[in-house]
From Swiss-Prot:
It catalyses: 4 porphobilinogen + H2O = hydroxymethylbilane + 4 NH4(+). Binds 1 dipyrromethane group covalently. The gene is hemC. One of its GO terms (molecular function) is hydroxymethylbilane synthase activity. The modification S-(dipyrrolylmethanemethyl)cysteine is found at C237. This is Porphobilinogen deaminase. It comes from the Bacteria.
Length: 290
């Protein structure tokens, strides 16, 4: 049996797809090949995502490949997947999640707490920028885009004091040794689905059940809780929004942030994990009442 798995052309996207292929090979005797696709989001790098249509731009071209039956499945970073799936598509599995935290990589290994006043920090994320300003109002936030390596190189090229990147991506491309500091999830609430990979298929695909073996239940319901939170707030890359759900002893805890009326609101909620979707919705409702 041969499966074609679509993914973006970036090194990180290809590594993430290889992770899924390795998991598939361990579970089933399946030959897999990658179909590399340059998405609209990859082509337009000089403009911020919220001005050109959002993170869905990383997904749409890949879904077209599945519609045209050029690919059997796709691998995405769940933080790039819009909360509304197109008709006929589904996320069939979310394997065990990687580290969800954000990391700081600095020039000359200077710690975040030791940054000079007015330090220039690179990030294209509204969520990161807003939380950086809460931690250090004096910081100068510089918008940057590009793949992981490109953004790290911009520290010197654009005379930055540092950049903020997801720990998961750095680990997957073996660049985590460059990390200067890790942000706690309460001081820098992660993006919805950060650190998680999702396998997308057409609902009618005859072999889709093979991917279900890769599902990690607790990781999946945590991501689904975060996505319920985002859906209730109608959040996207135009929004300053983040959430992180975690589970301990069957109890789920979710922390979420959302910008409302020019104010960053942060709330937390706890409940049994079987109520994961209700918890995400309830947390959003608490924020809307603030």
């Amino acid at each position: 049996m041969n499966f074609v798995i679509a993914t973006r052309r970036s090194k990180l996207a290809q590594v993430q797809t290889e992770i899924i292929i390795d998991l598939l090979n361990k579970k089933h005797d399946i030959e897999c090949e990658k179909l590399l696709i340059e998405t609209v989001g990859d082509k337009i790098l000089e403009v911020s995502l919220d001005k050109i249509g959002g993170k869905g731009l990383f997904v749409k071209d890949i879904e077209v490949a599945m519609l045209e039956q050029r690919a059997d499945a796709a691998v995405h970073s769940m933080k790039d997947v819009p909360y509304e799936m197109p008709k006929g598509f589904e996320i069939i599995a979310i394997p065990e999640r990687e580290d969800v935290r954000d990391a700081f990589i600095s020039l000359d290994n200077i710690k975040f707490k030791d940054l000079r006043k007015g330090a220039k920090i690179g990030t294209s994320s509204r969520r990161r920028a807003a939380q950086l300003k809460l931690l250090r109002p004096d910081l100068d936030i510089v918008p940057i885009r590009g793949n992981v390596q490109t953004r790290i190189e911009k520290i010197k090229k654009e005379n930055l004091d540092g950049v903020i990147l997801a720990v998961a991506g750095l680990k997957r491309v073996n660049l985590d040794h460059l990390i200067t500091d890790y942000f706690d999830t309460k001081e820098m609430v992660p993006a919805i689905g950060q650190g998680a990979l999702g396998i997308e298929v057409m609902e009618e695909h005859p072999k889709k059940e093979l991917f279900k073996d890769l599902d990690h239940y607790n990781s999946k319901i945590c991501v689904l809780a975060e996505r319920a939170f985002m859906r209730e707030l109608d959040g996207d890359c135009h929004s300053t929004i983040g959430a992180y759900a975690s589970i301990k002893d069957n109890i789920m805890h979710i922390i979420g942030i959302f910008e409302r009326k020019n104010k960053i609101i942060k709330k937390e909620i706890t409940g049994t994990k079987d109520q994961y979707e209700k918890l995400g919705i309830s947390l959003a409702e608490h924020i809307l009442k603030d």
